[in-house]
Every structure is written in structure tokens, then in C-alpha cells.
Amino acid sequence: MYPDFPSKFIKASVLIAFWAGINMGTHVAFSIGFGFDLGPGYHAYIQTHGSLQLIGWVGLFIMGVSIHFLSRLAHFKFVDENKITLIYRLMVSGLIFRFFFHSILPYFHDSIWYGILSLGVVISATLIAMGIYDYIIFLISIVGSMQPSLFKTNRDIRVFLIMNIIGWVVYAVGSLILTIYMMASHEVSLIHNWHIFLVDFFILFSVFPICFGVGLRALPLFLRLPPIKWNVKKFSLIYFIVIFSLINFKLINHYIYIDWLQELIYSLSILKDMIIIWFLEFNS
């Protein structure tokens, strides 16, 4: 039995985007607009706002859509509704914890309450990581149950699904490590460079690939469009190689500054953009 469309994920993503994301964004804009002292909490608010939008809005939306469409694409009928509900509760609980505890943490930096509030941020990252873990188990089941008919070059989206899994894993583990380090070092925000790296990694490895995968397989199927005739597998491998190279060169550049490496990163970024534009133009 295929699962019903998990609309609760979509509803939660919209509510978090408007209730929590816009709430924090308004707070930051108000402080800047009226010239209030931003203080050490500025980066914390920016990071929390970004995380709520990325995981709360985009992430929950991706989860809801992929659970519905991917299970049907792979003819995977053994979806445990209780497991889907558990993923939802863990993700939403973690996001609410992040919003509440990280919003007020900067105001209690030198207070006895810092330990409790920072622990709340760590718990939020733990809950989100647990939700992502259960979601990844679902994705692995989907990849493992794909029928040979889906392995044709114009239908094979396994590389995109594997990239999606890698993106979720790295973001979940990385965010948990950064929050633990934040609490241990008595800070109110995550290490900026590594936080930005995780965001970029998640977008390049999870957001874009799942959009490619669902767009290539689900839209023609459900909208009764002509099937894809070009080599999807080759396209996915090209995208993976470009993104893998871009991420690794950025890591090297973080530790070792080389002039030509900057130009290479810039060139790979342009190539990545060209690949995305080609996909949009070719499938419009």
C-alpha cells in the first residue's frame, strides 16, 4: 500500500517559514533598521534563521514530496506510516527547539542559564539528526528496491538519490558537531565558515539533486509528458563530478591559499551554474 501524500510535512514547512523564519528575520531587520546594538547574538540569529528556512521550509518540503513520489517511482509499497510520522515529529520538534533555545541563548551568554539553553540547541540538532537518519533509511530502501527497468540510461536517477543521502548525512552530522562545539566553547553561534560550508554542501548535494531526480521522473509520469530521451545517468555523473570537485577544492582552499585555485573554484562554480541552466532550458 503506497503512503498517502504526507501533507503535514508541507503544512509544517510553510508554518515554520512564516512563524519562525520571518519572525527571526524581522527581529534582525528591526535591529539593523533602527540602529540597535547587534551584539554577539547577530550571527546566532542569522544562522538560526537560515537553518529554519533551509531545513524547516526546504527540507520538510523535500521530505514530504520525496516520500510520496519516490515510493511510487520505485513501486515501493512497504512504507511504514508510523515511521513517516516519527520522522515528522522528530524534525518538527528539533526545529521548534532550535527556534526557541537559540533565539534566547545570546541574551544569557554570561548567565547560569547558558548551560541549559545551549544544551537545548544541542538537543534540537540531535532530534533533527534522528529524523534525518530515519528518512535516510527510507531513501536507502527506495534505492535498494528499484526495479531493473529503472536502470535504463534515460531513467536512472540513482546517482541523484545517493547524492541526496550524502547531503543529508553530512549536514546532520556536521550540524550536531558544530552545536556541541559551540556549547563546549561557550559561544552563542556556530563556527561561521563551517556552517556556511554545510549549507552549501546541503544545497549542492541534496536540494538540487532531488529536484533533478523528481523533475526527471515524476513530472513526465504524473503530468503525462513525453518521456526523457537523453542520457540521464551521464548527466547525473557529470553533475556529481563537478560538485565533488568544487567541494573538495573549496576544502583545500580553506587550509591552503593558492592563487590559481581561486580561479579553478570560480570556473567550476560557473560550470555548475551552466549545468543547472542547461537542465532548466532543456526540460522547459
Which positions does each model-derived feature cover?
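Hydrophobic alpha-helical transmembrane segments of multi-pass integral membrane proteins
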Residues: M1-S284
